Amino acid sequence: MIAVTLILTGCGNGDAEKTDTKEQTKSVEEEGKEVKIESNEGKPQHEQLIKVMMRPEADYLNDETLTVYEQDIKKYDQTNQLITNDSITLLIGDYGYYDPVWGSLDCSAVIINGTDSSIKDLSFQVSIEDSDKVIPEKVFLDNTVQELTKAQLGNFLPNTGVPIVLSFPEENATGADKNGKEINTNNLKIHIKNIQYKTVD
């Protein structure tokens, strides 16, 4: 089964130890600022040479997920792509599958950092345009990718990308289907919105 990177939560101890003023200042400088982008709709784009890197947790992925990631890296690494100015762009990968057991449509993608800063703690919402037309009589809902941390993204530099698998839950899934279905990702158009991240200074 492909490892879907959607339900990812971070936890921490709120009772942080006290540090001196110098250390506190250093911490703020490293944290950077929090950025929120409502949508990419209507924003200018430009063509950019991008570099796509394997995610840091590659050693812990199963072979199937690793293969999907490697295919998308091969597809997009060192290529010129149209990306949204000063935002996050999603490029659709080659893997697409309807999983009747989990009642979801999964597809691979590459997240591109189109900003001028290194970033971390990235989260966003995704939706499929005309999701009711992907598979007849099925509707797939929006979903949220929660805080991809630096441990998951690595050094997420400008004009670089990392692979991901997105999952869209089926509305009113019955579990009646017994067989999965491969999806032609060329027919998918995915929108990204409510983007949030922190810059790394």
Model-derived regions: residue spans:
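Sec-dependent N-terminal signal peptides
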Residues: 1-4
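C-terminal motif of bacterial Sec signal peptides marking the signal peptidase cleavage site
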Residues: 6-10
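Short, well-ordered beta-strand segments enriched in hydrophobic/aromatic residues
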Residues: 105-113
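The feature marks short-to-medium sequence segments in extracytoplasmic or secretory-pathway proteins
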Residues: 112, 116-158
